[in-house]
């Protein structure tokens, strides 16, 4: 029995079905997909969440399909400019002098155009040659580290890692902001090892993309393939609690009780909710060791976001997404370190931050069928606190701050908007079914990654975890897919099943990786800085 049809639950269901394990997936909502679900309105097909996929078919989302022999079942699409940094043009900037209201810095898909991005970004943040050299050393070092060097930074922060390389606040601000999109946490709270692991793989794969059909194409495809293999998938079926055998010395799962009181028997149950929700509400703390309960209570989730879905009658953006951070007097291009910290401190106080960071994928630029002909769909979000934080600024104020920010970087937005659907934190919390509504239920902080991350198994026999709650590494949905694979493997081992051999890496891929590593050695030797020794 798998509870929840998000990426983690859908992946686990498919892999167990492929292994011949009878499996039922239950989803409380009437549509599959969790935060990757979709709704339709006036010819637009709209994501519930706000998504792009860092490694596309090259990463865990594709690995799930390759494990079941369906590697090409989802079509991940890229655009010429995969993203674009946008800021209001400052009076002294070249964009302002050229008469433009917005400074645009394209992020290309083609690696050959990356030097142009570096040049434009360096000019935009007024880098001196010394500062540019420091930034180059930082990124060269990151890309040429060994896996062992990366793992040594698991339990220290990204702030500690960056400090020996540069103190240039705009460089730190933009790098920290982009990694903040990965983890929905400030960079001084993020595990350096986790951030480096994710950034290196994203850079080397160069597969940031979006699936044809929308985000729902991923869980929908997993579930369709699982059903073809005999799995049962039920929607509109909520789980009230997970049931245990009576009188067992060690807790053992016996099934679930649904919201309508129906009991479904199962000797294995996979929860894709948060560890906190699973322990305290679905099972009950009395059934777990005290130390495990305390750990579940202490788990730190990520922040969440307010969202808006904007339907336009005209195409206003050509890139695959736009990102940035905008304030009244300051933005990410001219911040100080204090500005960056105050941005997140305000969020923890329940106040709209002085700089509003935004992230806005444009799904219809990847798949034109997601909007009527000639139209465009924007899905924008801005960071917000989880529901356990008392709001000093009411929810609608957060939503309006997000919209005000987007209007400043998308000229003509209001004139061409057909409708704008706003999603509050409360809505997202109810939809995904995780207490407080964190985007990542076990946040990737130094004490919650690597060896210190909760495992996919629990002290109760037959109870497992999958999704962004336990196990694995990665960004968002890719973390969930990797966790799903880890969970399925653990279940099969515990059931005494043989794990199927992994498909070996193709010789050309291995040769390319080896050649890339060799080519990087001279550059690494010449440019790498020596950060503080990990103790």
Please provide the spans of the model-predicted regions.
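A glycine-rich dinucleotide-binding beta-alpha-beta segment and adjacent secondary-structure elements
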Residues: 173-185, 353-359, 411-473
């Amino acid at each position: 029995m798998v509870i929840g049809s998000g990426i983690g639950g859908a992946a686990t269901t498919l892999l167990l079905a492929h292994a011949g394990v009878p499996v039922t997936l239950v989803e409380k909502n009437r549509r599959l997909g969790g935060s990757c679900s979709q709704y339709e309105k006036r010819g637009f097909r709209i994501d519930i969440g706000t998504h792009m996929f860092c490694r596309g078919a090259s990463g865990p989302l594709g690995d799930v399909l390759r494990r079941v022999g369906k590697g090409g079942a989802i079509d991940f699409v890229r655009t010429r400019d995969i993203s674009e940094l946008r800021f209001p043009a400052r009076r002294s900037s070249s964009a302002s002098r050229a008469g433009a209201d917005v400074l645009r810095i394209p992020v290309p898909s083609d690696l050959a155009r990356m030097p142009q991005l570096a040049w434009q970004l360096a000019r935009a943040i007024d880098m001196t040659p010394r500062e540019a050299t420091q930034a180059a050393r930082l990124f060269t070092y990151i890309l040429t580290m060994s896996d062992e060097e990366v793992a040594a930074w698991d339990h220290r922060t990204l702030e500690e890692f960056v400090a020996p390389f540069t103190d240039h606040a705009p460089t730190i601000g933009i790098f920290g902001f982009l990694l903040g999109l990965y983890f929905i946490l400030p960079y001084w709270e993020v595990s350096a090892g986790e951030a480096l692991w994710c950034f290196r793989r994203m850079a080397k794969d160069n597969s940031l993309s979006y699936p044809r059909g929308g985000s729902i194409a991923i869980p929908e495809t997993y579930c369709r393939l699982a059903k073809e293999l005999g799995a049962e998938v039920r929607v509109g079926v909520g789980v009230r609690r997970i049931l245990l055998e009576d009188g067992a010395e060690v807790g053992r799962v016996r099934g679930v009780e649904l919201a309508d009181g129906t009991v479904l028997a199962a000797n294995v149950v996979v929860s894709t909710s948060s560890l906190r929700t699973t322990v305290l509400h679905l099972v009950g703390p009395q059934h777990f060791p005290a130390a495990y309960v305390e750990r579940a209570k202490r788990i730190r989730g990520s922040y969440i976001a307010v969202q808006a879905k904007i339907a336009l009658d005209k195409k206003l953006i050509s890139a695959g997404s736009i990102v940035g951070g905008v304030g009244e007097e300051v933005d990410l291009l001219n911040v100080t370190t204090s500005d960056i910290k105050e941005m997140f401190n305000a969020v923890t106080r329940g106040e709209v931050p002085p700089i509003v960071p935004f992230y806005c994928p444009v799904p219809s630029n990847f798949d034109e069928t997601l909007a009527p002909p000639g139209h465009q769909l924007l899905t924008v979000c801005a960071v917000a606190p989880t529901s356990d934080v008392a709001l000093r600024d009411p929810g609608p104020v957060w939503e309006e701050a997000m919209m005000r920010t987007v209007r400043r970087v998308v000229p003509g937005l209001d004139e061409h908007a057909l409708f704008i659907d706003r999603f509050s934190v409360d809505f997202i919390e109810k939809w995904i079914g995780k207490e407080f509504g964190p985007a990542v239920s076990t946040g990737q902080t130094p004490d919650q990654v690597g060896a210190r991350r909760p495992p996919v198994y629990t002290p109760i026999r037959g109870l497992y975890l999958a999704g962004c709650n336990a196990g694995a590494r990665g960004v968002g949905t890719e973390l969930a897919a990797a966790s799903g694979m880890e969970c399925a493997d653990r279940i099969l081992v515990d059931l005494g099943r043989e794990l199927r051999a992994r498909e070996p890496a193709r010789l050309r891929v291995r040769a390319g990786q080896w050649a890339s590593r060799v080519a990087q050695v001279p550059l690494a030797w010449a440019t790498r800085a020596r950060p503080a020794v990990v103790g």
